[in-house]
């Protein structure tokens, strides 16, 4: 699509029917101009001001679909006494990767430039995200000199080690699903496990770390049907439930939603179980 577009043939792939996926992805570019109260209308009772601070939080479009994760992160920041600037509440919507994968390179670059300017404007030195996809893109595709990019599992563990976030160790049995983008994509395996171990008992599934199965969902997945995705999610959930854990934990909004479709059990983001054990 990118090559066709650069040669003035951008409509070739749209001649047979309407490309709804491309239209949907491009809407992320225009979402920067959507009033905050409309984009965040489902955050009942949350402070929607963007705030200030050297730490910035970027939820991203996937995490916006799991508002409990965002709510939990807000409580983590509050408990640690962290002053935070909320990027998404000032127009930062998407890291740009979905647009890039769809061949909409110009729109992706526009989105990346916008986000970069937003980060520089606020002078943040640490950027925290709950989305492994955003994490990888910010680290590899953005020029963010002087800004440390952290996944929220890394950030939460750092707060715990620094004595800024105090949690209690309970008897709840947890199991953890390694997100593809966080584990195989960014090599982050130990931090989420250390956080879980601080609040309860961790039970590992049969396939874990580098060998952990994909949840079945992807921002660029067009190869399998929705029904097939659900079947994969059920298989993954079944393996996790076989550990005897009471709660399935993951650290990716896409994985959380996908696995949730495959089980009637409890599926939580890492930040949620931390908040439940803050002392």
Stretch-by-stretch model annotation:
Residues 2-13:
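Single conserved hydrophobic/aromatic residue that forms the stacking wall/gate
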Residues 15-47:
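Membrane-anchoring hydrophobic helices of lipid-metabolizing enzymes
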Residues 36, 50-71:
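Aromatic- and Gly/Pro-rich donor/ligand-binding loops
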Residues 49-55, 168-174:
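A short, charged/proline- and glycine-enriched loop
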Residues 56-57, 175, 246-249:
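Conserved beta-strand elements of the Class I
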Residues 61-151, 181-279:
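Cofactor-cradling patches in redox/metallo enzymes
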Residues 152-155, 161, 172-185:
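Catalytic cores of enzyme domains
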Residues 161-172, 217-223:
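Short, surface-exposed amphipathic charged segments that create phosphate/polyanion-binding patches used
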């Amino acid at each position: 699509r990118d090559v066709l577009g650069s040669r003035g043939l951008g409509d070739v792939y749209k001649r047979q029917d309407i490309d709804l996926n491309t239209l949907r992805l491009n809407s992320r570019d225009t979402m920067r101009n959507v009033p905050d109260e409309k984009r965040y209308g489902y955050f009942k009772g949350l402070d929607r001001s963007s705030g200030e601070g050297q730490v910035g939080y970027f939820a991203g479009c996937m995490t916006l679909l799991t508002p409990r994760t965002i709510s939990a992160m807000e409580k983590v920041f509050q408990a640690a006494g962290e002053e935070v600037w909320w990027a998404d509440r000032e127009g930062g919507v998407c890291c740009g990767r979905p647009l890039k994968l769809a061949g909409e390179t110009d729109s992706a670059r526009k989105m990346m430039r916008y986000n970069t300017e937003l980060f520089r404007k606020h002078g943040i030195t640490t950027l925290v995200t709950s989305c492994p996809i955003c994490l990888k893109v910010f680290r590899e595709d953005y020029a963010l000199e002087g800004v440390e990019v952290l996944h929220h599992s890394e950030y939460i563990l750092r707060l715990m080690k620094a004595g800024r976030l105090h949690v209690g160790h309970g008897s709840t049995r947890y199991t953890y699903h390694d997100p593809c983008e966080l584990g195989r994509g960014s090599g982050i395996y130990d931090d989420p496990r250390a956080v879980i171990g601080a609040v309860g008992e961790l039970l590992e599934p049969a396939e874990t770390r580098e060998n952990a199965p994909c949840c079945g969902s992807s921002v660029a997945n067009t190869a399998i049907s929705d029904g097939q995705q659900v079947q994969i999610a059920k298989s993954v959930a079944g393996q996790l439930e076989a550990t005897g854990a009471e709660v399935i934990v993951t650290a990716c909004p896409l994985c959380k939603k996908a696995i949730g479709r495959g089980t009637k059990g409890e599926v939580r983001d890492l930040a949620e179980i931390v908040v439940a054990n803050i002392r």
